[in-house]
Amino acid sequence: MTDMERRGRATEAFFGRRKGKALREQQAETLNSLLPAFLIDLSAAPPEPLTSLFPVPVERLRLEIGFGGGEHLIHRALETPSTGFIGVEPFVNSMQKLLSRIGETGASNIRVYNDDATQLLDWLPDGALDQIDLLYPDPWPKRKHWKRRFVSKTNLDRFHRVLKPGGLFCFASDIDTYVNWTLIKCRDHGGFEWIADNAADWLTPYEGWPSTRYEAKARREGRSSAYLTFRKV
C-alpha cells in the first residue's frame, strides 16, 4: 500500500478499539498459534479461483464484516460446509474467541482478516462473493460520527464490485437510525434492490439465524431488530 493510500485510509475509521482485556497466556497462545494458518495475506495476489483459499472444496463464498464474538460465523460455517467464509474483525479479543472455536470444532471453511475490511474488499477480485453480512455494526450513534458508519456510498460501491450478479448484502441492526440510514443509502446507490414485501420480511430473523450476544443485549434493553436483505442488480 502506498503512502497516499495510507493517508486516504486514515479517514476511513470504521472501528474503534483494537484491544479489550489483556489476553490470558493460554488465549494468547491460541491466537498466536492459529492465526497464521487462517489469516489471509493481502500482500499476495488473490488466488485463482478464490475458492482455493480454503483447504476443503467450497462452492460459494460469503464475507462477514465485524464478526464480534464469532457466534454467527462459526454457526454458519458448521451449518453449510460447502460455503467458504471470510470473517473480518480488527478486535483482538474477538479474533481470539473465533479462533478458539475453530480449534474446538475443526471448521476448515473459514479464513480471517484482522484489519480494516476496506483493505480486504479492495483486494478481492470482481464478482467474487455470493453474500456479504454486516450484522450489528457499530452504529456511531452521535450525528457528528455518522460519517464513520460502514454503510456509505464508497463501501456500497465496493460491495457492488465484489458481489456476483444477484449476490446478497444482509444487514442487521437494532438501531433505528442506522436501519433507516442503510435503506436510504442502498436506495440512493441504485445498485441494490431491497428484498421485502411486508414487515415480516425485515422483522423476522434470517433463516437459520443463531441468536447473538448483541441481539440478546438489544432485547434486554427493549429494542427490536431489523434484518434487511439487498440483492445486487
Curated annotation (Swiss-Prot):
Binding site for substrate: K142, D174, T212, R213, Y214, E215
CDD domains: AdoMet_MTases (cd02440)
Pathway in which the depicted protein is active: tRNA modification; N(7)-methylguanine-tRNA biosynthesis
Active site: D138
Annotated residues for binding of S-adenosyl-L-methionine: E64, E89, D116, D138
Name of the protein in its database record: tRNA (guanine-N(7)-)-methyltransferase
Cellular component annotations (GO), alphabetically ordered: tRNA methyltransferase complex
Lineage of producing organism: Bacteria, Pseudomonadati, Pseudomonadota, Alphaproteobacteria, Hyphomicrobiales
GO molecular function, one term: tRNA (guanine(46)-N7)-methyltransferase activity
